Amino acid sequence: SALPVDLTFVDAEDRVRFFSEGPDRVFARSKAVLGRLVQHCHPPKSVHIVDQILSDFRAGRQRVAEFWIELRGRFVHIRYFAVRNPAGQYLGTLEVTQDLTPLRALTGERRLLQYDTPAA
């Protein structure tokens, strides 16, 4: 829950095996998605894109797919990474999602240490 990004891992058989939990997840996840085909976790209109990414990763044609969208007034960055073992065998896909809205609002510079949140 301390990560500034949301992580979801889909295995080589296209099944959701892990997702990070946190109070500010961009896309809500419940434990019910674990073991489910990732295609069943996306709107029907985008399943063909999911299939294309997975096919390209599996075949080694691509390593990263990247999107950014406006969602409920937020600027959301979504990246997919092919995960491979040292021998190059495809193990699955890691989805990394981040709300970049606060970062897009930054201006100027901060060169000195300044904490914005209190210690836990």
Regions found by a protein language model. Name each.
Residues 100-101:
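PAS/PAC or PAS-like capping segment
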Residues 61, 66-76, 91:
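Per-ARNT-Sim (PAS) sensory domains and their PAS-associated C-terminal
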Residues 58:
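Short basic alpha-helical hairpin corresponding to helix-turn-helix/winged-helix-like nucleic-acid-binding
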Residues 1-55, 107-114, 119-120:
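PAS-family sensory domains
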